[in-house]
Each structure stands twice: as structure tokens, then as C-alpha cells.
Amino acid sequence: MEAAHSKSTEECLSYFGVSETTGLTPDQVKRHLEKYGPNELPAEEGKSLWELVVEQFEDLLVRILLLAACISFVLAWFEEGEETVTAFVEPFVILLILIANAIVGVWQERNAENAIEALKEYEPEMGKVYRADRKSVQRIKARDIVPGDIVEVAVGDKVPADIRILSIKSTTLRVDQSILTGESVSVIKHTDPVPDPRAVNQDKKNMLFSGTNIAAGKAVGIVATTGVSTEIGKIRDQMAATEQDKTPLQQKLDEFGEQLSKVISLICVAVWLINIGHFNDPVHGGSWFRGAIYYFKIAVALAVAAIPEGLPAVITTCLALGTRRMAKKNAIVRSLPSVETLGCTSVICSDKTGTLTTNQMSVCKMFIIDKVDGDICSLNEFSITGSTYAPEGEVLKNDKPVRAGQYDGLVELATICALCNDSSLDFNETKGVYEKVGEATETALTTLVEKMNVFNTEVRSLSKVERANACNSVIRQLMKKEFTLEFSRDRKSMSVYCSPAKSSRAAVGNKMFVKGAPEGVIDRCNYVRVGTTRVPLTGPVKEKIMSVIKEWGTGRDTLRCLALATRDTPPKREEMVLDDSAKFMEYEMDLTFVGVVGMLDPPRKEVTGSIQLCRDAGIRVIMITGDNKGTAIAICRRIGIFSENEEVADRAYTGREFDDLPLAEQREACRRACCFARVEPSHKSKIVEYLQSYDEITAMTGDGVNDAPALKKAEIGIAMGSGTAVAKTASEMVLADDNFSTIVAAVEEGRAIYNNMKQFIRYLISSNVGEVVCIFLTAALGLPEALIPVQLLWVNLVTDGLPATALGFNPPDLDIMDRPPRSPKEPLISGWLFFRYMAIGGYVGAATVGAAAWWFLYAEDGPHVSYHQLTHFMQCTEHNPEFDGLDCEVFEAPEPMTMALSVLVTIEMCNALNSLSENQSLLRMPPWVNIWLLGSICLSMSLHFLILYVDPLPMIFKLRALDFTQWLMVLKISLPVIGLDELLKFIARNYLEG
């Protein structure tokens, strides 16, 4: 049944053709079950494990590597002699890399799907219904409840479906619906229709929502919707429909991969075509087919050389290290790739309650009457420090500390706060903080009593557990609470009836203490308390009191005000009818006004500084709250989202105002606005969509089930540590301390991580460019192989991987939070950088080939062949006069390969030093600023020595140990790369960056 909240109870009953007393007939139940289906959220149809595995191989680079592995595997079958071990190592290693990558990918995907399953925990198991086949109420499984069922709920129950309340069987019915609406206090329900068909969930005061909890009272209602049609079901559908987008870096790497695969394909084809004339060379035994296979192997080597196999592992390691650093700052990252996305966040949409504020109501102002002279009335106004439930803070008058006990009015005010109250404070020893037990508003009053300490109780020697309620206990010993007249909507107040304790001399007779909404309480006051006397309440005095309350309730503070009053001579206990709440108003008459307290959910101390940091970093902060607009704007002014006197007409909207705008203006509003009040979860998703249409990268916070769709849709969903399991599983990050400042720290970390990733991605790619140039040159010039795939894999994975990982430890730039967020479209490698890598890569390739050629042409222990013989080595046979006196086996010697590999590794170590900074010289930023990098370079070189000097590794890698002169040559060829890069950095600094 749609819009059940706007219908009367009679309309709801007749819509389903049911009576409130008997319930549905078995026949109706059957029909409704067929029509509406069972009352449960369908399980999510997740992808099968096989589908997830196949998805990991949709990447072009992965497919090229897979093809290369298959081809090498086939070729390895046909190898003979010693070669076979080496030949099988290569496809085996490639497959291992691919399997490892696929496992990581599948694991991450699996995590993402748990969000929808977590909604299940809010499904109630059982429900209590009235049906025509039984006289009394019966318990049935919640999934069997159908629309039209008459359901009974009582305190402690979980609501089994969306229910329109028919009758309330207790004084009040309070429901905790924070999981759905994010409201921090429980909501009082009623049975009257809510005439607005577009009312937000917070305003549907006659509805109970599936999955919420009954906090107090008992009621009977009719089921309006079940299963997916309930509010929680709609949330599930929104989540199921939300597709996860790739992070900016993932998109960049995908684009890069596609370009790279096209380039690889072109180069492979080019190498084949250049050498097509060599297919018949004698070295292949004159067989065209074997020649083709040989060049096929070179093409495979090229593919292996061009793909940075170590990159996924290095990125994962760097992100994992980043998440550890973030965890120390209370930001727990659930999805690794999102660490980098944080770096380009341009908008943070934050909840107000608990994130920007402490979610700990605290009294910050109060007043009592100072004196009344005819119609002239003066007040004593006080402010109170401290913004949490901790019983620490001072009472100030005119900004100077005062002792509350010296004001009689404050003693009585503290008495009312302590007695007209069912809550208390509790010191949580594991967390080391004070927490509320009971309602937030009442706990604020309990804390106020502790701060006031009107009877000068000795509290310094008490432990924190004893300190929690010390002053309240003293007051409660003086007066004994007999009974409570519960809060009700019509009188908007509650009261307690107290009698003096036996030993007490303080109070003379019985008293009634009242607290409630100021207008309601003051209307029932005939007197005001001045010191210890009472004075009749006149019109002008009442006006003065109401004007201060109005001033506190609007303007900068927008405090929530409570009036406190006493009935000095209440009726006798036995004359009061306590089970008829309609009579409560009569008993709370003839009151004496004592004072007013103003409370708010105060902003966190560190938030103002964080918002300024965001402003400096070019990040817009938008506050989104279910609170009313006045309170929202006031908090925005307090924390610096709006300045004190800024005009906010087109920068703050309620959910309703936003909906009333035409679509184009809604989109425009999201571009300007910094405050949305009275919003529903669906608005959050809409706001994220509009922001994304402007290419903004949005971080969205939330803690309730209702926030889950928006958390899933935003690039960065941020759940609160105290939030629901659904919100946590739908998010990328969880704030352990629920603190807005933690988000800003995480953004800073994200920016630093991205900068470091840029450095090592570029470092690894320039290494691959060098390898490709090397293989291309050997093939184009007709030289013997300088590097084989197994060696390339070793370099890409191990020797390059270690320094690349260490580059992730580069210290962040000092001005990292003074720059605007980078655009997600900013390329990883721009024009000039591309030229730089080609230049460095060209040098690496030429140096590697040069080192191999040097051994053939000039080395003391080399064969001293001529350049012509070297470039035509394929025609070498015993009968060819050009190669007289030369053993053709020499062209397959391991020494030139060892020279080439050693030069490649040494140059890469120099390149790692070059990558310490994008444009800073090594003289300005010396190697020891990143001690990890120096360590990893030493480790990489040690591993290189390992494969050169420790058997049987040289045989597997086809290498031979080098002597001192050969190592000197390696250094001579390698070190100039530092000079070359310094020159390119100098040009970039002085001529390209203005």
C-alpha cells in the first residue's frame, strides 16, 4: 500500500478488507502471499567463482602475457639438451604471476559483495500477528507476514515490516530508527494521518519501519508493505543497482595497458617483417619454418620485455603500506585501490551528527531569574564549557568561572536536572571515555549537574568510574523519586513526584519537578523563582523569558531549549490517577518557573582547523544532515563552512526545496551548495550523481543502513566505526574514531601515496622501454640475442621490483595540502615526461646492446669478431669463407648476455636514484632521504650477484661470472644515465616549469 502514512486508520483497514480485532482470514493470507511474495529480502545473486576468475583475464596485457606463456610452453616442448630447464622456467613464471594477480583480484571482488548480505542482520526472525484463525495473538516467522496483517509490537521488538500504527497501547511509543534515518534520539510515534504524501521518513510519525527497534511502549498496527517494498528493501535495491566504478588510477593503468598492447603488437610484427629475409639462414638448418619459430620466440621475448610484470605487486604493496599508515591515524581502509582515489577527492560530503559534531548533547548555556521589579526582570545567564559527556567543565558568568552553589536558583535547577531524569553516565574503561546510559538529552542534564557540583562534593580523589555520577547521587539522596509522569506529545513535558528523604532537612514537603518544551511549560507557570522566593509571573516577565529562549533557539546557536519548573504543593499521591495520561496535564499546573537550559550537539574541537585545511587544498566540504535547516546553517557557521555573515540563500537547501527545483537547477545547486538539511538517503545518492556529472571525485560519509546506497555510489564511501555493519561493508573506508579530521588526514596520505606511485610506475615503465629498445635493436641489426625472456622476467619482477617498492616510502612534499586536487583525467605520463622516458629508455637499450657487442668486438677474453661477422652471425657455417677460423658456437656464449644483463641492472639502480624526485636534482635531494631505497638497491645488486656466482643459477639464467675489468666496463657504460637524467631535469626545472 503506497503512502499509508497519509491515510486514516479506517482507510488502511478497508484497503486490505481487514478488521483490527480479528485480522486476516487464512484465505486472505494465501492470496496476499501470492500477490506480494514472502516478507524477506532476496539473497544477492553474486557472480560465481568461475565468472570472477574469467573476469581477471579480460585485461589486454594479461591476455598478451597468457598468449606468450602458451607459446613459450609449446616451444619448450621442442627444445633439446640443456636448454629444456631454462625453456620451461619462463612459461611457468609467467603463469605464476597471472595466477597470483587473479587471486588478489577475485578476493577484492568477493569483499565488495558482502554489503548487501549484511542487510540480512536487520531482518527480524519473528513477528506477533492477529489472524482470524486464532483468538489470541500468535508468533509466526517474520517471512510469513503479509500486507494487511494486524501486528503487535512492544518494547525490545524488531519491527517485522513497514507498519501503519492503528492504536498505541501505552502512554507513549518510542522507536529507535537511527539505522534507517540517522536520527540520534528515539522518535515518539502517534496514530494521526500525516497529510503530506511526499513526507520524508523522519516526518512519517505514524509509521514503523522494518528493521527498526521499539525503545518504549506497545502498539498495534497494520502491515503496509513487506519485503523489497519496505524502506529497507528499497535501500537493498538501490545497492544492488549500483555498479562499482574503477578508481582513477585503475582507469589510467587500463588505458596505458591498451596503448602498450597496441605498441607491442606493432613492434612484434615489425621485428618479424624486418627479419623475414633471415628465415632461411643456415643457423636455422635452412628450414624456413624453424627460422619463423626463432623470430616468434623473439616476439614473445618482446612481449615479456614490454609488460611491467612487477607493477601489480608493487602497487599492491605500496597501497598496503599506505593503509597501515592510515590505520595508525584511525582510518581503516577496506578496499586497497581507494587509497589512491582519496588523493584526488574534490568534494567531501559529511554527515553532521557524530562526524562534524561529537554526537554527545551538551548544555552550553542556562539562565535563572536574578530579580523581578514590577514588570522589569533581569536574568543571570551562564555558559558552560566542555563538549562531551565527560563530567569536566566550568560554569562561567560573563566569561569568568563562578561557583554554581552560591546561586540558589542553580541549586534548584541542578536538583530538577538530576531527579527529572532516567539517564546516567558510565565510564567505559576499555575505551577510556564517558558514555551515556539512556536518552542523549537527559544525559546532557546529568553531565551538567556533575559540572555544576552545587553541593561542593569532594570529587578529586574519586576514580573515573565513581566520578561519573557523584554529584547526581548526592542530590538523589536528598529527595526520593516516587513515580514518573511519562512524556506525552500533547503536553510536551514530563515530570517526577518526589518526597524528602528521611534524613534530609533540605526539602519541606513533596515536590513535583517538571521539564519540557519551553512554550508548553511556561504556559502552565503562575510564578517564577527568584533566589528562594517565588514571585507571580506577569506578562512582561514572560515576554522577557520567551525572547531570550527565541534568541537562543535561532541565530548563531540554534540551541535546543528545555524549561525547568517545580510544583511546590502537588496534589496528594492517592488523589492522582496514574494510568490515565490525559490527566497528567492537570497535575502539571500552577508551576513555578526555575530556569532554562540550552543544549546542542557541539562541533568537534578539531573540525574547524580541518575545514580550513580542506579549503587550502581546494576541497569543498558539504554538510548533509537530517536536522532542520536553522540548526544545520548554525553549525556550518560555527565550523567555518559558511562565514559568520555570509548570505546562504542559494548555498543551503532542505531536501524538499531541492526536490522542488527543476532538474537543471538541482544539478547547478549541487555545484554551489555546502549544506543540505532535512534530507533522505535518496537525496544523498542524487547529490553524488550530480557531483559526478561535474567530474568531481566525491567522498561520502554515513553510518546508517539508509546511507549504504550513497556510500556505494560515491568514489569513496566512508563509514563510521560506530555505524551499522551494512554501512561498513558498503564503504571503502571506516573511521575508527568517527572524526571528520581523520578524513582530511587520509586525503593527505592518499595524495602522498599517488605521488610516490607516479614515481615508481614511471621508473618501471622506463625500464621496460629500455628492454624493448634492446630487443628491437638486436633483431633489427641482426645481432645475437642480448637478453632472453627468463632474464627479463627476473629483472622486471625482482631486481626492479625492490627499488620500485622502496620508492613508495619517499617523504611527502611539504606543500601537498596547498595544491588543488589533481584532475582524475590528468595523464600519468605527459608529453615531456614521455620524451624523457623515451630518451632514458633509448639510452638503456643502446647501452645494453652495446655491452653485449663490446664483448664480441673488444673484450680481452672475447672472440674479436668483426662488426660484419657479428651482424651476419646467422650465416655462420663451417663452409662459409667469411667465418674462417671462427667457431660458430661463440655466438651463443653466455658472456655477452651476462654483460648486457649486468648493464641493465646497474642502469636500473641508477634510474631508481633518479626517481627520488620528478624534477629535483640528486644534489638537492640526496639518496639518503629515502633510506629504504638505498637498502633495496643493495639487496637487488646482491640478488644479481647471486644469479651470477651461485650454482646452479648461472645455468638456468644462461649466465657466466664476470671479472674485474668486465665490471669496470659495466660501470663505465651505466653511470652516464645519471648525468643524462640530471640534464633532462635541469631543462624541466628551468625552461618548462616557467
Curated annotation (Swiss-Prot):
Q: Where do the annotations place ATP binding?
A: T353, E442, R489, K515, R560, T625, G626, D627, R678, K684, N706
**Alphabetic keyword roster:** ATP-binding, Calcium, Calcium transport, Disulfide bond, Endoplasmic reticulum, Ion transport, Magnesium, Membrane, Metal-binding, Nucleotide-binding, Phosphoprotein, Sarcoplasmic reticulum, Translocase, Transmembrane, Transmembrane helix, Transport
| Transmembrane annotation, as ranges | 49-69, 90-110, 254-273, 296-313, 758-777, 788-808, 829-851, 898-917, 931-949, 965-985
- Provide the catalytic activity annotation: Ca(2+)(in) + ATP + H2O = Ca(2+)(out) + ADP + phosphate + H(+)
Q: Name one Pfam family in it.
A: Hydrolase
Phosphoserine is found on S581, S643
Residues that bear Phosphothreonine = T441, T569
* Cell location: Endoplasmic reticulum membrane; Sarcoplasmic reticulum membrane
Any keyword rRNA processing? no
GO BP terms in the entry: apoptotic mitochondrial changes; calcium ion import; calcium ion import into sarcoplasmic reticulum; calcium ion transmembrane transport; calcium ion transport; intracellular calcium ion homeostasis; intrinsic apoptotic signaling pathway in response to endoplasmic reticulum stress; maintenance of mitochondrion location
Q: How does it sit in the membrane?
A: Multi-pass membrane protein
Q: Which family does it belong to?
A: Belongs to the cation transport ATPase (P-type) (TC 3.A.3) family. Type IIA subfamily.
Domain remarks: Ca(2+) and ATP binding cause major rearrangements of the cytoplasmic and transmembrane domains. According to the E1-E2 model, Ca(2+) binding to the cytosolic domain of the pump in the high-affinity E1 conformation is followed by the ATP-dependent phosphorylation of the active site Asp, giving rise to E1P. A conformational change of the phosphoenzyme gives rise to the low-affinity E2P state that exposes the Ca(2+) ions to the lumenal side and promotes Ca(2+) release. Dephosphorylation of the active site Asp mediates the subsequent return to the E1 conformation.
Which proteins does it associate with, and in what oligomeric form? Answer: Interacts with sarcolipin (SLN). Interacts with phospholamban (PLN). Interacts with myoregulin (MRLN). Interacts with DWORF. Interacts with VMP1.
Q: What does this protein do?
A: Key regulator of striated muscle performance by acting as the major Ca(2+) ATPase responsible for the reuptake of cytosolic Ca(2+) into the sarcoplasmic reticulum. Catalyzes the hydrolysis of ATP coupled with the translocation of calcium from the cytosol to the sarcoplasmic reticulum lumen. Contributes to calcium sequestration involved in muscular excitation/contraction.
State what protein this is by name. Answer: Sarcoplasmic/endoplasmic reticulum calcium ATPase 1
Organism per entry: Rattus norvegicus
Per UniProt, what is the name of the gene that codes for the protein in this document? Atp2a1
